Amino acid sequence: MTGVAELDAFLEKLSLEEIECHGLVLETNLCRVTTRSVGQTMIGDRMITYHGTQRAVTNNHGSTVYGGSDLICVRGGWTELEKLPMDTQARLAVSQARTYDRNTDRYPGFLASRRNYDIGQGIDGRGRWRSGVFEASWRSGGASTAELAALMAFAEDPALQVVEATSVKQFGRRTTIPRGAVIHFHDDDPEDGPLLRYTVVTRALRRAA
């Protein structure tokens, strides 16, 4: 939508009952977007917290889709993550995700073993740089395999403090699989066609970088 008139025309098509039942979400359209993932995953007494970026790829039908995530994971919680060196945009994304996450404290007894927040950063229609959380995911998602790979690495080596892990989704028959990757799927998908999905730990440090 490019203006208020288009928005009004769209809203006129919706009934009040639909809005009351399903709600209405409006998002700012951004150009030159970077999508960042920030979150926390806990299994048993083991917790990691992470930040990273998502990858966009072209699928077998010519559409731009999610192609995986590159995560930097720390052992522990938000405080440990914030000790890592990171650029200004990444630090803002972590701050915004943590603010969003803090609101779960308003719901006594709330528990989510995975809390992932997607933050969009880009240029709006007026040429201004914007950043904000546009999705919260408290279920398994595209980056979950990278999170699990980091958890496993931390479990296998108690001295590790930082793990960088990547989840990858590649379309087509020309694919590259790096050494040490765990392959989840490498075949023809009935809907997506030739598809490769794998996860790999790319770096592990015994102290913060």
Model-found features: residue ranges?
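Internal metal/ion-chelating core segments
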Residues: 1-54
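Glycine-centered flexibility motif
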Residues: 1-4, 23, 52, 62-63, ...
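Generic structural hydrophobic/aromatic packing signal, biased to beta-strands
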Residues: 26, 38, 51, 117-119, ...
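Functionally constrained cores in energy, signaling, and assembly domains
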Residues: 36, 40, 108, 121, ...
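C-terminal active-site "lid" helix and adjoining low-complexity regulatory extension at the edge
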Residues: 138-139, 143-209
